[in-house]
C-alpha cells in the first residue's frame, strides 16, 4: 500500500515538473513572438509614414506656386524666422528689440536689419526663375529619385538666407559698428556715463563727466582684441587698434600696467559693462605713501596661541616713562594683601623692568624660572639664589597641622627672620611680593609664593588671559637630589598646609 502511494506521488511530481518546463518554454516562445510582432508592426508603421510623407511632398511640389505664389522665398524666410523667434510676423521690429545685444538707449537708431526684408521683396530672383522651370519639368516625372532631388533643391533655396536679417543688430559696415557703440550709453547703473569715440572727443568731454576715471575707468569698444597685444607703458602717442583712445587710456599714468583697468570679453561688441571698482584692482597710487596705503589693507591683530605672551622692549620703554614708581608700589602692596596670592600683572609693570638695567631680548617671555634668575642676577645674596629655592625647600620641616593662614603670616613676618623665605611649590601664603617682579627699592623688595600665578597682560584694546602655571612645574626636576640644609629657615610642605587652607576657606 505504501509502495503504491509513493509511486503515485512520484508520477504526480514528474507531471508537475513537465508542466513547469512546458510553461517556461511556452513563455519564452511567446516573448520571442511578441518581439517579432512588435518589430513587424513598427516596420509597417514606418513604411506607411514614409509613403504618406512622400505623397504630401510630391503634392506640395506640384502645387507650390498655386499655394504660395511666386514670392515663395521671402514668405518662407519670414515664416521660418517667426517659428524660431516665436514672434508675430506682422511686426518685424520686435525681432530687433528682442536682441540681447541691443541697447536700451532710445537715441541709438536701429541698424539696417529692418530694411533687409524690404530689399528682398523686389521680385523673383534668377534662382527662383530656375526653380520654376525645374519645378514644372520635374512634376511630369513620377520616380522617387526626381521627387527627392526636388525636395533637396527646394530646401536649399529656402534655407539660404541673409545673416543680417536673423541678427538685425549686426550692422555690415565698420562705420555703423563704430558709430553707435562709441556713443552708446552704459545703462547698467549710471545713464550719464558715456563712452567717447576718440582722444579729441574725450578731452572735450572731461569737464562733463560726473565720475573720475579712477572710480570707473572707461572701456574701449573695439570689436576684436589683437592677438599680439602686449602693452607695457601707456604714452600719449599710443593708439588703439581702431585709431582712437578712450579717456582711461589717455589719462592713465605712464607707470600703470594693463591689469589696472581690466577689459571685458570682446566677444559681443554691442554690450559694454562697468569694470571693477578701484578698491578691487591691484592699482596703487604712486602719490600716496606706502604706510597710508597699508593702513586700509592690513588689520593689526595680535593672536597669540602660546601660554606666555612675548614682550617687546620698545613698547615697554615708552610706557615705563609714564608709569610712576609710587603707583607700582601701591599696586603691588594691594595685590599682596590677597590671601590666595593671585598676582595680576599688566604690561606696564612687566616692561618697567627694562628701565632697571636688564638686557632683555625682543621676545623674552615671563616664566617662573626666568623670574628667579632675573632677581638672583640683580641681587645675588638676598633673596636666596635659584638653586637654594629649588633644592632646599624641604629642609627643616616641622609639624604645623594646627596652623592657620594668619598664624603662618605672623610667623613669617617676624623681624627676627634673617633670610627671606624660600618658595614652596604648594604653599598658600608665606611672604610678600610677586614672583615675576621685584620692587624698585631694596627696602620694599619682597617675594610672593602661591599655588598659582595668574598673569593677565593687557594689550592695546584687548586683554589675553593666560593659563595658570603652578610653581611646582619648575621645581620637580631636582626636588630629591640634594636635601642638605644650608640655612635654618622653615618651609611648609603641602600636607602641612591642608588644615591651614581649609580653615581659611
UniProtKB/Swiss-Prot annotation:
Biased composition range(s): Acidic residues: 203-212
Segments of this protein annotated with the region Disordered: 81-147, 160-212, 242-293, 311-339, 414-441
Biased composition (Polar residues): 90-102
Start-end of Basic and acidic residues biased regions: 283-292, 318-336
Stretches with biased composition (Low complexity): 250-262
Superkingdom per UniProt: Eukaryota
Listed name of the protein: T-cell activation GTPase-activating protein 1
Source species of the chain: Mus musculus (Mouse)
Amino acid at each position: 500500500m505504501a509502495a503504491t502511494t509513493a509511486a503515485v506521488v512520484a508520477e504526480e511530481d514528474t507531471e508537475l515538473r513537465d508542466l513547469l518546463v512546458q510553461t517556461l518554454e511556452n513563455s519564452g516562445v511567446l516573448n520571442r513572438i511578441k518581439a517579432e510582432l512588435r518589430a513587424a508592426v513598427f516596420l509597417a508603421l514606418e513604411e506607411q509614414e514614409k509613403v504618406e510623407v512622400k505623397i504630401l511632398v510630391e503634392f506640395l511640389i506640384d502645387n507650390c506656386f498655386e499655394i504660395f505664389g511666386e514670392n515663395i522665398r521671402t514668405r518662407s524666410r519670414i515664416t521660418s524666422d517667426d517659428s524660431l523667434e516665436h514672434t508675430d510676423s506682422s511686426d518685424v521690429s520686435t525681432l530687433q528689440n528682442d536682441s540681447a545685444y541691443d541697447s536700451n538707449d532710445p537715441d541709438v537708431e536701429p541698424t539696417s536689419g529692418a530694411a533687409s526684408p524690404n530689399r528682398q521683396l523686389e521680385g523673383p530672383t534668377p534662382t527662383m526663375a530656375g526653380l520654376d522651370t525645374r519645378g514644372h519639368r520635374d512634376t511630369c516625372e513620377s520616380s522617387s529619385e526626381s521627387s527627392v532631388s526636388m525636395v533637396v533643391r527646394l530646401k536649399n533655396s529656402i534655407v539660404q538666407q541673409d545673416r543680417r536679417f536673423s541678427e538685425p543688430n549686426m550692422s555690415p559696415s565698420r562705420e555703423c559698428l563704430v558709430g553707435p557703440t562709441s556713443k552708446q550709453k552704459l545703462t547698467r547703473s549710471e545713464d550719464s556715463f558715456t563712452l567717447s569715440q576718440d582722444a579729441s572727443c574725450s578731452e572735450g568731454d572731461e569737464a562733463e563727466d560726473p565720475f573720475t576715471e579712477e572710480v570707473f575707468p572707461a572701456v574701449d569698444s573695439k570689436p576684436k582684441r589683437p592677438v599680439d597685444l602686449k602693452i607695457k607703458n601707456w604714452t600719449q602717442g599710443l593708439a588703439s587698434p581702431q585709431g582712437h583712445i578712450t579717456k582711461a587710456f589717455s589719462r592713465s599714468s605712464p607707470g600703470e600696467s594693463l591689469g589696472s583697468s581690466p577689459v571685458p570679453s570682446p566677444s559681443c561688441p554691442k554690450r559694454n559693462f562697468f569694470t571693477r571698482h578701484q578698491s578691487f584692482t591691484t592699482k596703487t597710487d604712486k602719490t600716496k605713501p606706502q604706510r597710508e596705503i597699508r593702513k586700509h589693507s592690513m588689520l593689526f591683530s595680535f593672536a597669540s596661541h602660546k601660554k606666555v605672551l612675548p614682550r617687546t622692549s620698545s613698547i615697554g620703554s615708552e610706557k615705563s616713562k609714564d608709569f610712576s614708581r609710587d603707583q607700582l608700589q601701591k599696586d603691588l602692596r594691594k595685590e599682596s594683601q590677597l590671601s590666595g596670592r593671585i598676582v595680576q600683572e599688566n604690561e606696564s609693570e612687566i616692561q618697567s623692568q627694562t628701565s632697571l638695567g636688564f638686557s632683555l631680548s625682543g621676545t623674552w617671555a615671563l616664566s617662573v624660572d626666568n623670574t628667579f634668575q632675573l632677581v638672583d642676577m640683580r641681587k645675588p645674596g638676598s633673596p636666596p639664589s635659584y638653586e637654594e629655592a629649588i633644592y632646599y625647600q624641604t629642609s627643616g620641616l616641622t609639624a604645623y597641622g594646627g596652623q592657620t593662614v594668619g598664624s603662618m603670616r605672623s610667623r613669617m613676618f617676624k623681624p627676627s627672620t634673617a633670610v627671606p623665605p624660600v618658595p614652596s611649590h604648594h604653599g598658600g601664603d608665606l611672604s610678600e611680593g610677586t614672583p615675576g617682579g621685584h620692587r624698585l627699592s631694596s627696602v620694599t623688595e619682597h617675594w610672593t609664593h602661591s599655588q598659582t600665578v595668574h598673569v593677565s597682560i593687557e594689550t592695546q584694546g584687548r586683554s589675553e588671559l593666560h593659563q595658570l602655571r603652578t610653581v611646582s612645574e619648575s621645581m620637580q626636576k631636582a626636588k630629591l637630589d640634594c636635601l642638605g640644609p644650608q640655612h635654618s629657615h622653615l618651609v611648609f610642605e603641602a600636607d602641612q598646609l591642608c588644615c591651614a587652607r581649609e580653615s581659611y576657606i
